[in-house]
């Protein structure tokens, strides 16, 4: 039971911090990895990992494929919204559309998979900590904790981004570069979480609001809480 408890704590930590970062830098209270398509891309990467023979054999290929899927989703959404001068509404809309596309591709993978593969993928998509063991904990702990510490280090920049791109530029911060870097870190964290627990939605949406009502809106205090 101890690996599952540790896994639940790590996944909750990762999703909550990723959601808090996305809500702050996008200035949108509904932003989180699930609604922006990051979780959908990670799930698609894991689904591909489960059906490709040489990937399914490797034990630690799931976190890698989940990170790649999440990163590709972020790149697609970022490329679409950059044409509209990075409108927050267009970013959220693009993320939701991409999430539906990823879900459709996962269903397409289901239709061409074997019954045993479908069973394992359905069990994974429902979200579960039953298969977590110590080797998996060791694999995800280092990148997840490192990602959270990096976000804590950039907490001041995240707070400045909440003022808007123009004011952030006047304060010596390059908004687009910082935002792109933060997207990569949140993709890494989300990929690690999805790889071990499957699709768990709305943790990254609810927890930042709950903790914000307790410790306030400052990013450093919010991440530590």
Regions found by a protein language model. Give the residues of each.
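Alpha-helical transmembrane segments in inner-membrane proteins
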Residues: 1-225
């Amino acid at each position: 039971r101890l690996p599952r408890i540790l896994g639940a704590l790590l996944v909750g930590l990762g999703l909550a911090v990723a959601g808090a970062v996305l809500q702050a830098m996008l200035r949108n209270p509904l932003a989180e990895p699930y609604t922006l398509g990051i979780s959908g891309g990670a799930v698609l990467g894991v689904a591909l990992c489960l059906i490709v023979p040489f990937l399914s054999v490797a034990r630690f290929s799931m976190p890698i494929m989940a990170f790649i899927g999440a990163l590709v989703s972020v790149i697609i959404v970022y490329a679409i919204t950059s044409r509209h001068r990075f409108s927050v509404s267009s970013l959220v809309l693009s993320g939701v559309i991409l999430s539906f596309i990823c879900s459709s591709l996962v269903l397409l993978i289901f239709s061409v998979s074997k019954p045993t593969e479908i069973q394992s993928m359905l069990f994974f998509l429902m979200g579960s900590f039953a298969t977590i063991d110590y080797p998996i904990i060791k694999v995800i702990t280092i990148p997840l904790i490192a990602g959270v510490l990096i976000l804590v280090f950039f907490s001041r920049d995240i707070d400045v981004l909440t003022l808007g791109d123009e004011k952030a530029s006047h304060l010596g911060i390059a908004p687009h570069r910082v935002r792109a870097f933060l997207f990569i870190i949140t993709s890494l964290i989300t990929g690690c979480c999805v790889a071990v627990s499957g699709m768990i939605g709305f943790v990254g949406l609810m927890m930042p609001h709950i903790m914000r009502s307790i410790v306030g809106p400052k990013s450093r205090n919010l991440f530590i809480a």
